[in-house]
């Protein structure tokens, strides 16, 4: 596993890596309340659907562990916890992992057996169950990511019969690695596994405007891991596919997902849809890597997904560390500069939806799902319990 950690946790203490300071500075913020977690998620100091859910759950756990709940009965304790979870959910409603974590934790506290306990004992039992369930979300995520990496690499090997003489090149978008999860990553986890198994020739990552998760975070992870890699702007993908597909054996676009709905439509970072269209045009496989917790079987199509609108300043301004005259980077100094006329109108959706017709495979920790003869992704074959 990569030494990079977006989340450091021990019972009663949570630290979150401030990803806005990367790649030049490593700084962990202590997160001890739901309000601090909300701000951390909203300002994108932590991002990535799995990491968002983990931070929200663990922040509430830390808060409870440290005595924030003053309820005097189990009913009041559950009401308090519900309020904390509902508040945290609003920090990023697009991320289905967060919604699933909220549902799981609400069910957990309601399933606690309190018969024969005093009110004080029942309250403590509810809090203990909540904390343990939150910690299990963290532990399960790492195992999930490694399984996604293995299944994704296996599927690509089956498609291309990769050998030492025919290693593949892939492209990824946004950040889906250790910084977006508890470790290893989803889409970037597949790339790591390809590298570890000697199947990877090269990886390209997009800049991912306007928040630059690709240039700030994915490029940093790829370099940190020693994976042969190149950074491109979002607008260079078509030219890359046209000019270098054969030369570099570009085989796949591999992306993560904030939400995959029942028919396979996928919401992910803005710019994903255009990559899918380009990949289809150039005969390149398009893969989505996501845990089953990111699959929303209650939402039928991508048309129903709520798309978050981000601040205009993300397009018109940019911040960064100061580069000295000798080329060195001064991490103690950061400047914010205008890169557009501040009077211009701005449309800044945080996500887009890729229709299922452009997706070749959806890789989960339970296996890889491809479309059947009817052109549909049959998630019910993978997780029948969710369709009962």
From Swiss-Prot:
| TM helices/strands, residue ranges | none
The record's comment on protein family reads:
Belongs to the eIF-2B alpha/beta/delta subunits family. MtnA subfamily.
Q: Where, per UniProt, does this protein localize?
A: Cytoplasm; Nucleus
- Active site residues of this protein: 258
Q: Which residues are marked as site: Transition state stabilizer?
A: 174
Q: Which NCBIfam families match?
A: eIF-2B_rel (TIGR00524), PRK05720.1 (NF004326), salvage_mtnA (TIGR00512)
Where is the major localization of this protein?
cytoplasm
Q: What is its EC number?
A: 5.3.1.23
Species annotation: Sordaria macrospora (strain ATCC MYA-333 / DSM 997 / K(L3346) / K-hell)
The record lists its disulfide bonds as none
One GO MF term: S-methyl-5-thioribose-1-phosphate isomerase activity
User: What's its top-level EC category?
Assistant: isomerase
Q: Which domain of life is it from?
A: Eukaryota
Output this protein's name.
Answer: Methylthioribose-1-phosphate isomerase
Q: Which Pfam families match?
A: IF-2B
Q: Name one GO cellular component term.
A: nucleus
- The answer to whether keyword Isomerase applies is yes
Gene that produces this protein: MRI1
Described by its record, this protein's role is as follows: Catalyzes the interconversion of methylthioribose-1-phosphate (MTR-1-P) into methylthioribulose-1-phosphate (MTRu-1-P).
């Amino acid at each position: 596993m990569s030494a990079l950690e977006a989340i450091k946790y021990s019972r009663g203490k949570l630290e979150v890596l401030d990803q806005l300071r990367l790649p030049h500075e490593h700084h962990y913020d202590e997160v001890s309340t739901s309000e601090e977690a909300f701000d951390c998620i909203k300002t994108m100091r932590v991002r990535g659907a799995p990491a968002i859910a983990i931070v929200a759950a663990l922040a509430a756990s830390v808060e409870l562990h440290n005595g924030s709940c003053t309820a005097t009965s189990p009913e009041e304790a559950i009401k308090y916890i519900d309020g904390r979870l509902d508040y945290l959910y609003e920090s990023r409603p697009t991320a289905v992992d967060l919604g699933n974590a909220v549902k799981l934790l609400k069910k957990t506290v309601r399933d606690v057996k309190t018969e024969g306990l005093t009110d004080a004992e029942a309250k403590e039992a509810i809090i203990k169950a909540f904390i343990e369930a939150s910690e299990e979300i963290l532990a399960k995520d790492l195992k999930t990511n490694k399984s996604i990496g293995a299944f994704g690499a296996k599927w690509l090997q089956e498609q291309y019969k990769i050998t030492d003489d025919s290693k593949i090149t892939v492209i990824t978008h946004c950040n889906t690695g250790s910084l977006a999860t508890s470790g290893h990553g989803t889409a970037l986890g597949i790339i790591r596994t390809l590298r570890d198994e000697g199947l990877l020739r090269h990886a390209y990552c997009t800049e991912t405007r306007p928040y630059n998760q690709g240039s700030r975070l994915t490029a940093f992870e790829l370099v940190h891991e020693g994976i042969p890699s190149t950074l491109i702007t979002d607008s260079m993908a078509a030219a890359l596919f046209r000019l270098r597909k054969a030369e570099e054996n570009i085989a796949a676009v591999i992306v993560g997902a904030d939400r995959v709905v029942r028919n396979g439509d996928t919401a992910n970072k803005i710019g994903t849809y255009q990559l899918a269209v380009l990949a289809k045009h150039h005969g390149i496989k398009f893969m989505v890597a996501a845990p089953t917790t990111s699959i929303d079987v209650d939402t039928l199509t991508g048309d129903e997904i709520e798309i978050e609108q981000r601040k205009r300043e993300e397009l018109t301004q940019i911040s960064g560390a100061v580069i000295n005259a000798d080329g060195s980077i001064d991490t103690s100094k950061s400047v914010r500069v205008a890169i557009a006329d501040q009077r211009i109108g701005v449309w800044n959706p945080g996500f887009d939806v890729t229709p299922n017709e452009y997706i070749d495979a959806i890789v989960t920790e339970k296996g890889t799902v491809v479309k059947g003869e009817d052109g549909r992704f049959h998630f019910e074959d993978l997780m029948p319990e969710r369709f009962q």
